[in-house]
Structures are given as C-alpha cells and as structure tokens.
Amino acid sequence: PEDVNVFSMQTGNPTVPAYLADASFYYDDRTKTFYAFGTNDGAGGENVYPAQMWYSKDCKEWKNKVIAFPKSWTDYAGTLCVWAPSIEYNPDTKKYYLMYSIASNTFVGMADDLLGPWEDANGAAPGKMLFKGYDGQFFMDDDRTMYIVTDSWHFKIMKLKFDEAGKIYIDNSDPVFAKSDSNPFIGTYHYTQIEEIKNAFEASFIFKRNNLYYLMWS
C-alpha cells in the first residue's frame, strides 16, 4: 500500500509489513484462508487510514486489502483511533461480522465475504454506532448465541440478536443482563458487568474450552 513505509519503519514484524496491534486473527474453514485485522495506528503514533486487512492460504505469502468502512461511520467518528477489530461468522445468518471502535465509538459491519464489501449491520440505528466503548470482541457460544465483551476496568457483556436480514440488535430480553445504559441512536440497552478483577485494564476476550468459560484481559 501507499503508506507501507510507515508500517514497516520500526515494527520489525516478521509476518507482514504492517503495524498490526490488537490483531484479530481468523481462520475461515469456508475459504481455507487466514485473515488478520488490526488496530489502525502507525508505529510512532501516526494515524494510518484507511484500515487494512491481510490474508493468506499458508501464513507465508500474504496479501492486503483496504477495508472500506460505511461512510456514515467516519462522518460521525472521524478516522483517528481506529482500534481493536473483532471478526465472527454466524452460521444462522450466513454473514461475517466485523466490529471496530473509532475514537471509542463502536460500529458493526457485515458481509458475505471477509474481503468485503462491508455494509453497516446496526439494525436498531442503521449507519450509527452500536455503543460507546472500545476493544469490543465477539464471542459465540455453542448454541450460536453471540455476545460482545467490551470496555476497560469494568468489562461489559451484551447479548446479541439478529433479524432475518442479518442485522444486529442488543438483546434486552434476558434478565441476567440487568444493568442498562443508553445512547442517542439505539436508546436504552442492557448488559451485565464483570467487576472487581484485580489489575484489569482493557482488551477483554472470552473463549470456551471443555465447557469452561475463560476471560482474558490486559
């Protein structure tokens, strides 16, 4: 890309010539391809836009592609601090979902292919942010219920639901998610909060193994 010199000046990245902090690495069984998305900042703090993703069949030869965000995202949030993407595939909707925070405004997109094109996936407020926060990560449970874990210090977990077109909504019907917040676009939404974790800061991530749930953070 035109700005690859900014990426490669001081990173010493052995895999791709990119500064790929907060990397979201995804292997897709459907395409037999590895994909890498990451925070969009230069090694010295420079902003590098538009965001890019990298993909490879063998983790040796990599290609990159610019991610074209819906224009309404950057019209509202700008192009600085494009952080911490997350990728998930929902077999029920047959859509890929991409989540990015831009200046602590979190947006979700969807596509039929990880190479795009990406369209806005916010069902409650099309083209707008889903919630205020950053470092949001998807988690899909064994029953295909999807969640988002996000924020810093006290991590929030939100439950998701989808309409027939594959658009995302925050599911407010589960009484377990008893706390509430709001924003001017989607109104009130519910979540549960993970509190009192010693030294918890940001970048929360959930995975499941042998029927146990694990929460990671920085």
Segments and roles (model prediction):
Residues 1-218:
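Carbohydrate-active catalytic/glycan-binding domains of CAZyme proteins
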